[in-house]
Design a protein with these regions (language model features):
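Active-site cofactor/substrate anionic-group-binding motifs, chiefly glycine-
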Residues: 58-112
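Positively charged, low-complexity intrinsically disordered leader regions
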Residues: 4-76
Length: 117
């Protein structure tokens, strides 16, 4: 029964603290490693139903526009991999009080490992 670790994704310093806003922000090598890691994670979840590969990690889903499928797919994937999810929408954020999206992101990145927008 082989375990899983984030391997070269987490060991590679080029991923640390990086903002990925578009696929063009990733090199071919990074994309290749990302897809290989995703494939291993998918196979693991398919064979076991879930895993704790991302236990202790927190994902923030930040959606200011309605998005059922995208938001739910990231939420389900993170939970199947053992992580936790914080969901933020415009109605639940401080945007209602005038906070900018940039300020919201700065705040969330202090206690989340990844943000999906």
């Amino acid at each position: 029964r082989g375990g899983f670790s984030m391997g070269s994704l987490s060991a590679d310093a080029s991923w640390c603290g990086r903002d990925v806003l578009a696929v063009d922000d990733l090199s071919d090598a990074m994309l290749g490693e990302l897809f290989r890691t995703a494939s291993r994670m998918r196979a693991m979840v398919a064979s076991r139903g879930s895993t704790d590969a991302l236990k202790g990690r927190v994902l923030a889903n930040v959606f200011y526009e309605p998005s059922t499928r995208t938001m739910c797919s990231f939420d389900a994937a993170m939970k199947r991999l053992g992580g936790e999810v914080i969901s933020v929408s415009e109605s639940t954020s401080s945007a209602k009080k005038g906070e900018t999206i940039e300020d919201t992101v700065r705040c969330l990145e202090c206690y989340c490992d990844a943000l999906v927008m």
